[in-house]
């Protein structure tokens, strides 16, 4: 998935830096090893700056083993003397830490500016030749940070419960796109000295003036292994703590994709809350913005600690007097859809209904169907035929389809027929199993959608089916 942001002219217009994954066949399918190349328009020469070789000997001149993951998004310094880019260390692991590297075009030296910073870097912008600004996901938010290559110490500029998704700079002024769970994207100006925010646009003010939003609470939940997990709890508008409300457990996809302060018309927490539901959205194991150890834990352990994290979150909220534990549902997409399928076989009567969108149901068939072979190798531990691989065999032994005999709860299954990430046949398998077992089940297949539902009319249908199912079996 390379886009035009991965092609960068130098400021003099004489060189072009770009991302390329110079692999073919099986190697292309099982590896994420892309590199940054620089093309000189005058000489016609191309250089791989991530794996440079000596011109005379053809031998590598740096540690090749350190640059075998994704290397992406080159950005030239204003004087064209350096190139900043993002780099992942491990081949095949698309969720490895995104390190911020700087390449010196004169000396060919590499510098990792985020070696001591346990978060990903993204959206890199130079400020002059000696300072770099970037966005980092930190504790389920997205903040602007900066680092000077000469110092190498990252400074977090902004604070607060928000997602800064993109920004641009003019001199010392920063204009950024920002959203929250309760606000679609608007433009803000950011003071780089103190990180203060000043809203510039108010495109949806007339809409917000005529609707009510629910309160968003930040809740730290103790997990079964004694750690603290940040969980967003979104309450219905006009919430009355003396009343009881139905509760939804939201299972995040990815699986390495943060439950942040994102705003989406596809999975909108405020829209769910507006229907009278309390939404519980945990940042379970495997999600970024809490350090690489927290994120890495999920690989090879899909059925383990992160599932217990889900249950810790919903059980914690269910103990509140305003949460109706007799009216709880569980929803999710992609890996979240897998989570729904797995929980359907082990939830011990917690939930009254499930909704799975494009979820993984059968690990064996999924391995041979997905277009991301490097992903299943990394996250499952390997192929199903590798009987000597204990991690892989544990993954396949705990595939949701192995526990279908324990299903007993109504389930809505949604899929896109053009999904090649988690092919729609996974949803067909799950639907067939549920209906054969006599469990109330409904299949909604969009013939012109892929892994997500993007078309506006289809989105209306999706929401109608989503809330119709919950209202029937949960509310």
Model-derived regions, located:
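A flexible loop/linker signature enriched in serine peptidases of the S9 family
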Residues: 1-4, 19-37, 48-75, 86-101, ...
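Hydrophobic beta-strand positions that form the internal "hydrophobic ladder"
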Residues: 16, 83-84, 131-133, 174-175
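Short substrate-entry loop that stabilizes the transition state in hydrolases
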Residues: 240-245, 250-290
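Short loop/turn segments that connect beta-strands within beta-propeller blades
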Residues: 40-44, 104-108, 148-152, 191-195
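Active-site-proximal cap/loop segments of hydrolase catalytic domains
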Residues: 268, 273-274, 281-475
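Residue-level recognition of a conserved intra-blade site in WD40 beta-propeller repeats
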Residues: 9, 76, 125-126, 169
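Non-catalytic accessory segments flanking enzyme active sites
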Residues: 5-11, 15-20, 155-243, 260, ...
């Amino acid at each position: 998935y390379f886009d035009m942001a991965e092609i960068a002219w130098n400021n003099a217009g004489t060189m072009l830096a770009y991302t390329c994954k110079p692999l073919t066949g099986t190697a292309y399918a099982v590896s994420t090893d892309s590199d940054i190349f620089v093309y000189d328009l005058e000489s016609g020469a191309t250089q791989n700056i991530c794996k440079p070789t000596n011109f005379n000997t053809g031998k590598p001149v740096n540690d090749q083993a350190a640059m075998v993951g994704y290397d992406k998004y080159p950005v030239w310094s204003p004087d064209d003397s350096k190139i900043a880019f993002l780099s992942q260390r491990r081949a095949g692991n698309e969720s490895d830490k995104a390190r911020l590297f700087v390449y010196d075009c004169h000396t060919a030296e590499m510098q990792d500016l985020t070696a001591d910073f346990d978060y990903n870097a993204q959206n890199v912008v130079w400020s002059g030749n000696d300072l770099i600004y970037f966005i980092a996901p930190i504790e389920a938010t997205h903040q602007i940070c900066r680092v000077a290559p000469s110092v190498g110490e990252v400074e977090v500029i902004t604070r607060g419960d928000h997602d800064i998704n993109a920004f641009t700079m003019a001199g010392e002024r920063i204009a950024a796109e920002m959203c929250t769970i309760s606000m679609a994207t608007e433009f803000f100006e950011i003071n780089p000295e103190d990180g203060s925010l000043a809203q510039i646009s108010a495109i949806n003010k007339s809409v917000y003036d005529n609707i009510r939003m629910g309160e968003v609470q930040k809740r730290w939940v103790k997990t079964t292994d004694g750690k603290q997990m940040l969980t967003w709890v979104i309450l219905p508008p006009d919430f009355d703590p003396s009343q009881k409300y139905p509760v939804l457990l939201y299972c995040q996809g990815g699986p390495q994709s943060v439950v942040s302060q994102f705003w989406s018309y596809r999975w909108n927490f405020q829209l769910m809350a507006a229907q009278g539901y309390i939404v519980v959205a945990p940042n379970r194991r495997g999600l970024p913005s809490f350090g690489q150890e927290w994120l890495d834990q999920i690989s090879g352990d899909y059925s383990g600690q992160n599932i217990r994290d889900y249950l810790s979150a919903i059980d914690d909220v269910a103990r509140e007097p305003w949460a109706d534990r007799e009216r709880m549902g569980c929803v999710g997409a992609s890996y979240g859809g897998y989570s729904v399928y797995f929980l359907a076989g082990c939830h011990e009567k917690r939930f009254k209904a499930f909704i799975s969108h494009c979820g993984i149901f059968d690990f064996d068939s999924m391995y041979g169907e997905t277009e991301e072979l490097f992903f299943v190798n990394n996250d499952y531990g390997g192929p199903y035929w590798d009987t000597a691989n204990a991690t892989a065999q544990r993954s396949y032994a705990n595939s949701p389809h192995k526990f279908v005999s324990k299903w007993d709860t109504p389930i809505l299954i949604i899929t896109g027929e053009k999904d090649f990430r988690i092919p729609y046949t996974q949803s067909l398998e799950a639907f067939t199993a549920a209906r054969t077992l006599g469990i109330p089940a409904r299949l909604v297949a969009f013939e012109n959608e892929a892994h997500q539902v993007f078309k506006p009319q289809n989105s209306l249908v999706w929401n109608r089916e989503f809330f119709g199912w919950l209202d029937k079996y949960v509310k």
